[in-house]
Amino acid sequence: MLRDDAAVKLGRFYSEDEYDLSVLKSSGRKLLELGRSCLHEDYRGGAAMFHLWNALAGYVAEHDIEVLFGVASFHGTEVAALAQPLSLLHNRHLAPKDIRPRAQADVFQTMDLVPEDHIDRRAAMLAVPPLIKAYLRLGGFVGEGAYLDHAFNTTDVCLILDTARMNEKNRALYTKERNL
């Protein structure tokens, strides 16, 4: 995790190699970048994930964080194989312009690959990784464009969660009624 005040000291956020974050950095809002994490497969989707989200909610409340963001990954870099889920994210979950990072121009991979009326929504959502689904359930968005990370064999998308726009029902679930 990297708060905006710490990023200023470091000179940048980690995900700036992949995404132009100027719209977030100039927003005047308190930011928190979430880095890559991995939870052992035996604990994914269970109580461990709930406790991680709950601890994060406490940190967000303690530091008055307004916008959380970070990179999440699909396995693989074959864009054609990811066309449905990427297109679904672009068409249904694109961040509002005032908080929408964009993949760096020199590495920009469009996510708008399939016309919206040709997307198999069920199949596309099944292909979306659980972490991305969790952000979407909370009211999260994706930035514009993806980044093909050949070193890690992933296709990365930028996730953005504006705490003021969070889904109230799921906010209560993940925060145990913490004041977010």
Regions found by a protein language model. Give the residues of each.
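Acyl-donor binding region in acyl/amide transferases
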Residues: 3-141, 146-155, 159, 166
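Long, continuous compositionally biased terminal/linker segments
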Residues: 158-180
